[in-house]
Regions:
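Dynamic "connector" segments at or just before major functional cores
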Residues: 1-222, 228-241, 424-458
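An anionic, glycine-rich sequence signature occurring as long contiguous blocks
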Residues: 4, 24-40, 270-371, 452-458
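Short amphipathic alpha-helical "interface-anchor" segments enriched in bulky aromatics
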Residues: 57, 346-389, 393-400
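Acidic/histidine-rich, metal-coordinating catalytic segments
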Residues: 174, 244-256
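A short acidic (Asp/Glu
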Residues: 182, 257-262, 282-286
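Short, surface-exposed basic-aromatic patches at helix termini and helix-loop junctions that form
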Residues: 261-270
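C-terminal, non-catalytic "cap/extension" segments appended to globular domains
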Residues: 378, 383-386, 390, 397-458
Length: 458
């Protein structure tokens, strides 16, 4: 029977979409106020929209573009789908966001935020993991070294004003272990660490936190291996750019190398380097040890004292200052020695040396926050290039946070991800612009608005 009622018609082409929408709905019953229904029809959503100010900062100073200029692209231009610059940006910003594995590219290549960060048209997928892996195996040793030099250029450009105002550059030198678990080239067993590993060499600038150099070395390399050639490459640029600026260097006893002392003295660098105890040093401090032992027996309180003396080893061409710290407690006597050409009281020299603990914090952030130990390629050069990418990601964030409000200038990467980078947003493209609808309940909106001005060139 015809009732005269005619319901709304559904276009045939929409029936399949409607059925899929109904089938893909998820129901949750724990909420006592209403039924919860969820589906995957929200459109282009990202959880990393907070990286946009960092990308604007990068664009303003030409950082990724400058790095890409040092990397040759051997591919035929007519067959290139993903330019080298886009691959570089994709890989670097994934590292910054906490997606350190190349395999993560397969999950993120459709993410609208990363498409914007890589300057890729929205909706056009980014490169896959195999493409990134082939690209990582492309650079030569010369290109990697030149790219590291490009990072030094960026340091001079972005931090030069601070260096000239402070009139001091403080270099913290250290090495770190990078455990390996596969068949990586030049990965060897290191008895000191009791593991198969690489042994990277790192040089930080203390006042700015910048990583001026990171060199990958074979697993059996000593702590001080290649330190003088690496310092020479850095210092030639620093001395040329910052004449009259005092340069200081700190390192632990693994760098107690006479050639390094001579190098620093030749270039006028003030060095403070740990040096192992020996029979001569113990004999020169024997009276101090006995005096501290007597004080401890009288007071039963831990005792500490400092002294210094001049010493010339057989292989040294001159006398050098040795600073000693002696401690006596219930566990006995503890002796520490430094070799230095710095003036000042012995206690002040040791206090200056002990502040190099900040370098350990930087290394921890570099390895754990930026996952710089993910060097799982087979070829040594590919892993050296990966270390370069992680170094650049670290420095990009570090240069960025030097311009942040004072409360965040010392924040580590995990804090920056929580308070700035990890913001949920819906991305919508119109004929005129791309609109990013950030989460309305984001608790750091005012901070984000301030930070967003860092890359504003209007």
């Amino acid at each position: 029977m015809n009732t005269g009622f005619r319901g709304p018609s559904i276009p045939f082409r929409s029936i399949h979409r409607l059925i899929q929408s109904v089938l893909s709905q998820l129901n949750f019953s724990f909420y006592r106020h209403q039924i919860i229904r969820a589906d995957f029809s929200g459109g282009q959503i990202t959880g990393d929209a907070g990286l946009l100010p960092l990308r604007a900062f990068d664009q303003r100073h030409g950082l990724t573009r400058e790095l890409a200029q040092h990397l040759r692209d051997p591919r035929r231009s007519g067959r290139v789908r993903h330019a080298s610059l886009a691959l570089l940006r994709q890989r670097v910003y994934q590292i910054v966001a906490g997606y350190e594995d190349a395999n993560d590219a397969d999950r993120l290549r459709h993410d609208p935020a990363f498409q914007l960060l890589a300057d890729q048209p929205l909706g056009q997928p980014l490169s896959s993991q195999p493409t990134l892996s082939r690209w990582e195996n492309t650079p030569s040793a010369r290109e990697i070294v030149c790219a590291h030099d490009g990072g030094l250029d960026a340091f001079v450009r972005l931090c030069g004003k601070q260096v000239r105002q402070r009139r001091e550059i403080l270099l913290d030198v250290d090495s770190t272990d990078d455990p390996t678990y596969g068949q990586q080239q030049l990965s060897f067993f290191n008895g000191a660490y009791n593991q198969h590993m690489y042994h990277p060499l790192l040089i930080f600038e203390r006042h700015t936190g910048c990583l001026l150099a990171a060199r990958l070395r074979r697993g059996t390399a000593s702590s001080h291996a290649r330190i003088v050639p690496l310092l020479l490459r850095i210092l030639r640029r620093l001395l040329r750019e910052f004449p009259g600026v005092t340069i200081r260097l700190r390192a632990d006893a693994g760098f107690a190398l006479p050639l390094l002392y001579k190098f620093c003295e030749f270039f006028g660098i003030y060095y403070t380097i740990g040096i192992p105890a020996n029979v001569v040093f113990r004999r020169r401090t024997a009276a101090l040890q006995r005096r501290l032992a007597r004080r401890y027996r009288r007071s039963h309180l831990p005792q500490r004292s400092f002294t210094s003396f001049r010493h010339r080893a057989r292989t040294w061409p001159r006398l050098r200052r040795i600073v000693a710290k002696a401690e006596h407690s219930a566990t006995g006597t503890n002796l520490r020695f430094l070799v230095t050409n710095c003036p000042g009281r012995s206690a002040q020299v040791f206090h200056f040396y002990n502040e190099r603990g900040e370098c350990e914090n930087r290394i921890e952030e570099f390895k754990n926050g930026f996952h710089a130990d993910r060097l799982s390629c087979h070829r040594f050069l590919a892993n050296a290039f990966r270390l370069l990418l992680h170094t650049f990601a670290y420095n990009l964030v570090n240069w960025f946070r030097l311009h942040l409000p004072s409360a965040l200038r010392s924040a580590q990467i995990e804090t920056l991800r929580t308070q700035l980078f990890k913001i949920g947003a819906r991305v919508r493209q119109t004929a005129r612009c791309v609109r990013i609808h950030l989460a309305s309940g984001w608790p750091f909106q005012s901070l984000f608005q301030i930070v967003a001005q860092l890359g504003d060139t209007s």
